[in-house]
Amino acid sequence: MAKINELLRESTTTNSNSIGR
């Protein structure tokens, strides 16, 4: 479960970075 959480967190960070927020 920890791995999924980390992956989700990285995905969110990448998405936020793509938007430039």
UniProtKB/Swiss-Prot annotation:
Q: Name one GO cellular component term.
A: T=13 icosahedral viral capsid
What segments bear the compositional bias annotation Polar residues?
10-21
Please give the superkingdom of this protein's source: Viruses
Keyword flag Transport: no
- Record carries keyword Transmembrane helix: no
Q: Where in this protein does the record put region Disordered? A: 1-21
Q: Which residues form a coiled coil?
A: none
Q: Which UniProt keywords apply?
A: Capsid protein, Late protein, T=13 icosahedral capsid protein, Virion
Q: How is it modified after translation?
A: Proteolytic cleavage give rise to gp24*.
Give a short account of what the protein does: Capsid protein that self-associates to form 11 pentons, building the T=13 laevo capsid in association with 160 hexamers of gp23* and one dodecamer of gp20.
- Family membership, please give it: Belongs to the T4 phage capsid protein family.
Assembly information from the UniProt record: Homopentamer. A total of 55 subunits of gp24 forms the 11 pentamers. Interacts with portal protein gp20. Interacts with gp23 that forms 160 hexamers.
* Name by which UniProt lists this protein: Capsid vertex protein gp24
